[in-house]
Amino acid sequence: MKKNIHILGASGVGTSTLGAALSKRLPHTHLDTDNYYWLDKFTKKREIPERRKLLEKDLTINEKWILSGAVCGWGDNLKSYFDLVVFLWIPQDIRLERLRHREFQRYGNEVLAGGSKYEQSKTFLEWASLYDNAGMEVRSRALHEHWMADLSCPVLKIEDDCSVNERVDRVLDYLSSN
């Protein structure tokens, strides 16, 4: 059984959801990079050395874990911790619709024109829309593919829009056969 699993992909693809679901089926602690990246959720970033220190501490004190979210660019030193990387991808239109829905669930009417979170949400969604076609300068598929290319662990790619349960089953099937 792989002890340390990292799940990454674009914002809105379901890395946190899959991590949480897998942790209910495996004896693994679920950790999410957002809890290390953000000092104040989605508004103020933590300094990189502090992020690394906090995350590395949790990776070492937990015997088995699932880490959801991306560490590309700030946590490259953690690659050796991973026994399996799961890469998720779904079509952009589905992903952006999920993000719009999540933004509304999180902030309500404040994300609509004239609301206090409108500009922040608009900027976030514009950034998220770059994922499939942007270069290495932002969180993008190109950056993730480049980052995964030199991993020493296996990479399981799930590149279609399927249910959380189907994703869990694919990961569990992979783990049982490898």
Swiss-Prot record:
Gene3D superfamilies on file: P-loop containing nucleotide triphosphate hydrolases
Keyword Signal: yes
SUPFAM superfamilies per UniProt: P-loop containing nucleoside triphosphate hydrolases
Signal peptide: 1-19
Entry keyword set: Signal
UniProt-listed InterPro entries: Cytidylate_Kinase-2, P-loop_NTPase
Domain of life (superkingdom): Bacteria
PANTHER family: DNA TOPOLOGY MODULATION PROTEIN FLAR-RELATED PROTEIN, YALI0E33011P
NCBIfam families: PRK06217.1
Name listed for the protein in its UniProt record: Uncharacterized protein YqaC
